[in-house]
């Protein structure tokens, strides 16, 4: 399963990072930071309107190379200008060809919150996310049990970081809620088969209490998809490949937002 391969690769990456910069140092430096906009990401998805979280990614395991030239700073500017409420930046280097530098540069470029889209399997990565300027970290229920989710949310809370807790099925949604998640994202992509079906969000929406922000992720391509998710009361949609492949990310976002 590809998720297991990514997690194994990430574990090696984090262990190598710890040899370069110790866990105690990263934790200490992150803890010294003064977060001037704590929990900015969750405020963005709670504003009462359907929030568009727009993704910047160069490649993916399922689709290969998505953007060869990859003018990520221009894309970030276009997203913000077209009305994005937040930006998701892939930082996983092996399978998504991501980089922490992309997030640092995007954060300097835009005024909207930025999600670090990576595969969090170690507390080190949460402190690291704070240091590179992220407003939110991704926690994937398929990789983390309920107790670990609780632990990671507590660490993020102490840093003023939001957590987007991603689930794919009923049990994972329940785990996310039990862990105290304030933002639950339902991934419409089955990470075992890579099949995409937005009815997964529609089916699982009723399990998420109204005081928890609900984000639909993956496979959102059309005005009809947006309308369907708006009808079920989604707080936000996370859209990546549809925008990245469009040729004009800003215009495509404006088109989708106009349908909301």
UniProtKB/Swiss-Prot annotation:
GO molecular function, one term: phosphoribosylanthranilate isomerase activity
Pfam families per record: IGPS
This enzyme's EC code(s): 4.1.1.48
CDD domains linked: IGPS
Entry-linked InterPro entries: Aldolase_TIM, Indole-3-glycerol_P_synth, Indole-3-glycerol_P_synth_dom, Indole-3-GlycerolPSynthase_CS, RibuloseP-bd_barrel
Gene Ontology BP terms: L-tryptophan biosynthetic process
Class of the enzyme per the UniProt entry, highest EC level: lyase
Keyword Phosphoprotein: no
Keywords: Amino-acid biosynthesis, Aromatic amino acid biosynthesis, Decarboxylase, Lyase, Tryptophan biosynthesis
The keyword ATP-binding is assigned to this record: no
This protein's pathway: Amino-acid biosynthesis; L-tryptophan biosynthesis; L-tryptophan from chorismate: step 4/5
Reactions catalysed, as given in the entry: 1-(2-carboxyphenylamino)-1-deoxy-D-ribulose 5-phosphate + H(+) = (1S,2R)-1-C-(indol-3-yl)glycerol 3-phosphate + CO2 + H2O
HAMAP family: IGPS_B (MF_00134_B)
Family to which the UniProt record says this protein belongs: Belongs to the TrpC family.
Name of this chain's protein: Indole-3-glycerol phosphate synthase
Species per Swiss-Prot/TrEMBL record: Ruminiclostridium cellulolyticum (strain ATCC 35319 / DSM 5812 / JCM 6584 / H10)
Lineage: Bacteria, Bacillati, Bacillota, Clostridia, Eubacteriales
């Amino acid at each position: 399963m590809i998720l297991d391969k990514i997690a194994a690769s990430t574990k090696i990456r984090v262990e190598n990072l710890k040899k370069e910069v110790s866990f105690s140092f990263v934790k200490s430096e992150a803890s010294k930071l003064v977060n001037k906009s704590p929990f900015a990401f969750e405020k963005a998805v709670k504003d009462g309107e359907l929030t568009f979280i727009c993704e910047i990614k160069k490649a993916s395991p399922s689709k290969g190379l998505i953007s060869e030239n990859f003018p990520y700073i221009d894309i970030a500017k276009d997203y913000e200008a077209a009305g994005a409420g937040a930006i998701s930046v892939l930082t996983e280097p092996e399978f998504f060809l991501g980089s922490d530098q992309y997030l640092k540069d995007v954060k300097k470029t835009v005024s909207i919150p930025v999600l670090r889209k990576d595969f969090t399997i170690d507390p080190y990565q949460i402190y690291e996310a704070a240091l590179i300027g992220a407003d939110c970290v991704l926690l994937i229920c398929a990789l983390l049990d309920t107790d670990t989710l609780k632990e990671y949310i507590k660490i993020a809370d102490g840093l003023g970081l939001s957590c987007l807790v991603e689930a794919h099925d009923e049990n994972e949604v329940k785990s996310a809620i039990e862990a105290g998640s304030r933002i639950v994202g339902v991934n419409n992509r089955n990470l075992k088969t890579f099949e995409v079906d937005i009815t997964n969000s529609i089916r699982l929406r009723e399990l998420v209490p109204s005081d928890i922000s609900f984000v639909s992720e993956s496979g959102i391509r059309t005005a009809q998809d947006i309308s369907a998710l708006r009808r079920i009361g989604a707080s936000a949609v996370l859209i990546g490949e549809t925008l990245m492949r469009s040729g004009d990310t800003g215009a495509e976002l404006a088109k989708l937002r106009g349908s909301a």
